Amino acid sequence: MSNTLSFKTYSAKPGEVVRKWYIVDAEGKVLGRLASEIAKVLRGKHKAQFTPHIDTGDFVIVTNAEKIGLSGKKMDQKTYFSHSNYPGGVRIDNVKDVLQKKPEQVIEKAVWGMLPHNNLGRQLFKKLKVYKGTEHPHAAQCPVEMNVN
């Protein structure tokens, strides 16, 4: 019989977390599946030292945001709703229109919906970098290719 009192739950300290940079090419990927994988890495759930209340996640760079795919008829039917809090200030945008104007916003909104909506979630979201096209200014961080099915 082992002494179970000697086992302690590991809790990561913010100073001892080692962060890596990952890069993902969004070309031909399905939006929801890509966003859930990105959210996992941003949160740090892919690491053994995951601690729910500490930011243990890594940085993620997404390129080719304009070439993201959506399953089914979502390209025509999915809408984004916003309101300016003024009378008549409702704004409803179609995904197709948003992809043409600001393709980065589609991926950012999908990932934000999968992160916690609190101070930690806002801190995690700052580690997501989304770019239109293949160019990005983070070559100095030596990002590693992230496999997303």
UniProtKB/Swiss-Prot annotation:
<dbReference type="InterPro" id="IPR036899">
    <property type="entry name" value="Ribosomal_uL13_sf"/>
</dbReference>
<dbReference type="GO" id="GO:0006412">
    <property type="term" value="P:translation"/>
</dbReference>
<dbReference type="GO" id="GO:0003735">
    <property type="term" value="F:structural constituent of ribosome"/>
</dbReference>
<dbReference type="InterPro" id="IPR005822">
    <property type="entry name" value="Ribosomal_uL13"/>
</dbReference>
<comment type="function">
    <text>This protein is one of the early assembly proteins of the 50S ribosomal subunit, although it is not seen to bind rRNA by itself. It is important during the early stages of 50S assembly.</text>
</comment>
<dbReference type="GO" id="GO:0022625">
    <property type="term" value="C:cytosolic large ribosomal subunit"/>
</dbReference>
<dbReference type="Pfam" id="PF00572">
    <property type="entry name" value="Ribosomal_L13"/>
</dbReference>
<keyword id="KW-0687">Ribonucleoprotein</keyword>
<comment type="subunit">
    <text>Part of the 50S ribosomal subunit.</text>
</comment>
<dbReference type="GO" id="GO:0003729">
    <property type="term" value="F:mRNA binding"/>
</dbReference>
<comment type="similarity">
    <text>Belongs to the universal ribosomal protein uL13 family.</text>
</comment>
<dbReference type="InterPro" id="IPR005823">
    <property type="entry name" value="Ribosomal_uL13_bac-type"/>
</dbReference>
<dbReference type="GO" id="GO:0017148">
    <property type="term" value="P:negative regulation of translation"/>
</dbReference>
<keyword id="KW-0689">Ribosomal protein</keyword>
<protein>
    <recommendedName>
        <fullName>Large ribosomal subunit protein uL13</fullName>
    </recommendedName>
</protein>
